[in-house]
Amino acid sequence: MIKDITIGQFFPGNSVIHRLDPRIKFTLTFAAIVFVFVANSAVAITLMTLAVFSVIALTRIPVKLYFKGLKPILVIILITSLLNIFYIRTGNILWNWKFITITDQGLMRSALIAVRIAVMILISCILTYTTSPTDLTDAIERLMKPLKIIRVPVHEIAMMMTIALRFVPTLLEETDKITSAQKARGADLESGSLMQRVRAMIPILIPLFVSAFRRAYELAMAMECRCYHGGEGRTRMKQLHLSSRDFATLAFGAILFCGVILCNQIPPSL
């Protein structure tokens, strides 16, 4: 399951989504995640889902990679959906047995939550799959630039956020390797009581922490060897400029979000 986590990876390409200004992509990604939770009708959430899959098609990245990124959260989606099914008692009763009651509102709410979580992950994957670490850092730094007035270290914050995001797949891959190595040595990680399983994780966590600190040290040394000293005086080989394509994308996003608000008024509400 660990190797199925793909969020944080970058897949180079030349699609229209890859060529968008990273500031536009970051802004629309944040807004889209917000509007996924704003959508509270079947029509609104369907509109958001169709828009997300349309963008996925435009990225020219295999769809299976996006669905691969959903595998690790299937358990979370399932548990959340079941909780909503069994704990929501409003609406028409569809099935009742002792203390278990399933209603139509519970089913609709659980479906809405499941779709929301899945679409949110897909939106995040679109951003990381189509935006290089350098572009993502520049986008975050530019968007946070007004905070420099109150002496917030914008560049350093943007750099830390990007490094943390990009280290996710690296650490997950390292975890998978360590787990496989421990299993090859006879470690049993899947049986026993809860405390036994927790203790069995210690031989995995200690090497993982050592590896993480080693990679952090190597990265720090590499940045120091390249004379990196923060954002002050830093120049950029690639300057960000908004094009007509970016403004058109921004307008499309605004129309989509307005459509979601309007669709919320269409019954039935979830």
Residue spans of the language-model regions?
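Membrane-helix interfacial "entry" motifs
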Residues: 14, 37, 60-65, 97, ...
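Transmembrane helix-loop junctions in multipass membrane proteins, especially transporters and channels
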Residues: 41, 45, 60-64, 88-96, ...
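Alpha-helical transmembrane segments and their helix-start/interface "positive-inside/aromatic belt" motifs
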Residues: 25, 64-74, 246-249
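Transmembrane alpha-helix interface motif
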Residues: 1-42, 48-57, 142-145, 149-152, ...
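Alpha-helical transmembrane segments and their membrane-interface exit regions
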Residues: 51-61, 75-79
